Amino acid sequence: LFCFFAEDVGLLPGRMFEGLVNNRKLTSDKLTGGLRNLFTVMRDGGLYGNDDIPWFNGGLFQKISIPSLSVMEMTELRNAASLNWSAIDVSIFGTLFERGLDPSKRSQLGAHYTDPATIGRIVEPVLARPLLQIWELLVPVLQALLAKSTKKGDKHYKAAQVKFIGWLDLLRDYRVLDPACGSGNFLFLGLKTLKDIEHKSHIEAATLGLEREADLVTGPHNMLGIELNEYAAELARVTVWIGELQWRLLHGYEFKTNPVLEPLDHIECRDALLAFLPGPIPASKLPLPQGEGRGEGSPIPVEAAWPKASVVIGNPPFLGDKKMRAELGDAYTEALRKVFAGRVPGGADLVTYWFEKARAQIENGGLRKAGLVSTNSIRGGKNRVVLDAISKSTRIYEAWSDEGWVNAGAAVRVSLVAFGNSMQSAVLN
């Protein structure tokens, strides 16, 4: 899929990929070999036939394993290659991926599709609005300094330039974490929002009289993710890569080279809630029930660490108490409750653990804001304890308590909650 896109935006020369898959003289084995050769060159850069292929890197082609292709699969490849993939809506990747999963595991894997409008209700108050407020406060400062400047390079111009570079440094170092990223819908919109804000500031700074910077400082490095399913995590990386390339194409920026793709190791494939330290320890000391198949030398469950981020956004998986045991197992469920004892009450929905972890990071000063989607059951019962803890240590400043939404083909009611360090007036419907 990435190669379809890369070819249609000019990163691969001369309809090379389409020509390869459309060569009807190739047997399945020869086509597989041709794809393997192309992917190897894309990984390292260099000649493929007479064409010079850019160094793509990024990790997408790190492990090259091409499955055998049936006649029907080769036909489907040819049909797909005939389409124009340059304007593919990367937000549909989640839906495509979800349909390939066992429906009973969709909630557990967290790979359900969230429409852009819903994501926007989280991204706007948590990411976009606070950054735009910082920029809007900086603009009159730049205006005042440049009004005193008589020529480029004088002390007032340099002072304005330093202020603007400070703003760009803030954007460059900004980190957006989705700790249940699925196939990357929230990360894609977060990246687009950051780049839109930076682009706007470059245009306005140039209008004020500052020299235009050559390139942007925001990019895939700003996006952090955690996802349990390996395939979903890889799709999230592809979503971010294509989102970056599409944005640059749309706004007239050249593609980066050497490499074309930034490594996205910071979109991690692992559990966002629990980590397991190696044993050995006596089975009697394990924070798991006896008889769960974990004896001498079993790993010790501890709270999983999240990478340092500026904000957290996301749509954690929806699992109630009984479904947690059915889908995650008794041992995992008991371990989770013991590790978070005193913070998340037993019997609370799975999604509340993400809320509590975000709250704790805000309280410890490592995180500014968070915006998460939950089922509307978070408003009451044992789930409510987590919201009360958020209100005590920080504040909920924007929320939608009962919104319609579709998950795994079923209509559900959700709550969207933005909380953290914000001075904005509360918007609570």
What do the PLM-derived regions correspond to, one by one?
Residues 2-195, 222-232, 239, 270-284, ...:
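Preference for the N-terminal adenyl/adenosyl cofactor-binding alpha/beta module
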Residues 10-18, 25-32, 37-40, 117, ...:
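Signature of N6-adenine DNA methyltransferases within the class I
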Residues 72-77, 99-103, 217-218, 266, ...:
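Short acidic (Asp/Glu) and glycine-rich catalytic loops that position anionic groups and cofactors
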Residues 136-167, 198-216, 245-263:
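Short mixed-charge
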Residues 286-289:
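Positively charged N-terminal leader segments that act as targeting/secretion signals
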Residues 291-293:
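Glycine-biased, low-complexity coil/linker segments
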